[in-house]
């Protein structure tokens, strides 16, 4: 288990959003959080990230694991180019690269034992740089930006020139190059064309980490996720499989619950009719029997009638 939500509750004033929400996500798992608009999906992601506080419960992230978050609306500013904005998301790699360049220059002025010591340090740091993906990093940045729909000409554009949608794509690119252990993505396909969506699907499926997605695109979720967490009437319900698997299981659960509801309603009406009849006899014994049945009815845990499935998912063609 890499991420666990335990008994999360959240209200805004008198408006209850989440109630006793519990689920866990395994390492390398790809999961979706679904529900109607206003169900609390984005709020839940913010609670996981620590951008919102819950009224109760806790979020547990496995020790030494990193987490990254793409919100629906991003406002990336500054005077860098698109390419540099994403490139500088990994300053650790750039700093390692600069140290290697500095050592290469310093080697020209070193001889003998000093040179050997410097070369030993260089080889060790060069190996670490390779393990961190440093030698492929610049081409990786270019590949991710192109995958997200930016052309070669776009890469030299200033961030200040970009639209809100383009800035969100840049933010997504920055997140992808940092490779956190857990990716939280809130509507990652909103500003992508079909080609870029397909690229992102492939990227996330191959991603060596955990991915948690809020999205409205059913086909996208079908191709990426293997678990669905539904936020329904303030609580969380977990289904294994992709979105289509979830939809089938949810329909069956609703059908079974509807049968239970109608069966219970029939029994309640029957008991109410018996109570009315017993009271009509107007005898002490009959009234006591009626009162006994009323107490029994009061103790019954009423099944709520399941509402229509209005999960806010659309088909993107």
Predicted region positions:
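Alpha-helix initiation and N-capping motif
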Residues: 79, 138, 294, 308-310
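Generic structural signal for secondary-structure transition and capping sites
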Residues: 91, 209, 273, 280, ...
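A structural signal for long alpha-helical coiled-coils and helix-turn connectors
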Residues: 104-108, 247, 276-279, 298-301
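A short, surface-exposed helix-loop junction/capping segment
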Residues: 118-127, 270-280
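Short, flexible, glycine-rich and Lys/Arg-enriched loop motifs at helix boundaries
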Residues: 151, 280-286, 312
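Intracellular alpha-helical coupling/juxtamembrane segments of multi-pass membrane proteins
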Residues: 250-274, 286, 290-307
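Flexible loop/N-cap segments at domain edges
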Residues: 307-317
